[in-house]
Amino acid sequence: CSQSDNQNQAETSDAPPSLIEYVWHKAGSDFSEDNLSMLINSWNGMIDDAMCSGMMGANILTPEVANEGYDFIWVLLWDSQNSRDVCWDDWTTNLQSNWDSMIEGIMQYDLDNVYLFGWTIGQYPKIENTSGSFVNRFNFCNYNEGYSEADLDTFRDDVAATNWSDSYWYGLLDPKFEPADPAPDFVWLDLWANSAEKEIAQNKYNNSDLPSTTGAAFTCNNVDFSG
């Protein structure tokens, strides 16, 4: 679900975010959709009054398959590293203690699992998603033996040659931290407006020759979310 801005609106604007940050969260005993909505509204107000003008939007990702490390992920979109640092400094100094009291029993954030990535859009959607929700897939990929970034460029050209679904778009995430081994060679993020569009695109891909041609250059681990 979206919060201060819709991710697709933010990321397909004339000035898309240059950084995306993912903060792991666990639900508490008092967690509910109503309590989450209340916290989102409070958080939006706090951010509006904070030194966070460089935050371009935020949303929440819910995994399609349960993960023991998190129940959901709070996503922050930034226009620059400096803007991100200024906002976090202000938050930590002036707002965090109040927020901790507000969320007690409802949810917990994990500051040991905060992951910042550079963001480069690879392809824009044919039709902008204005629904306020979306689905996505993270692909953590490693080159197979004998392949390299040049083969990824060829694959990207092949992807661009097909309309997989009207709402489909993707980008590449560049970690601004040291990934745990085995570190991916690249992280590819697919996005769609809904599950139906996702299924259309995946069926087209699986029935194409890409999995056995340029798509055979790498092997990926996939993680799916709704937002």
Question: Where are the language model's segments positioned?
Answer:
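Conserved AMP-binding/adenylation subdomain of ANL enzymes
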Residues: C1
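Short S/T/G/P-rich N-terminal loop/turn motif that feeds into the first structured element of a domain
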Residues: S4-G227
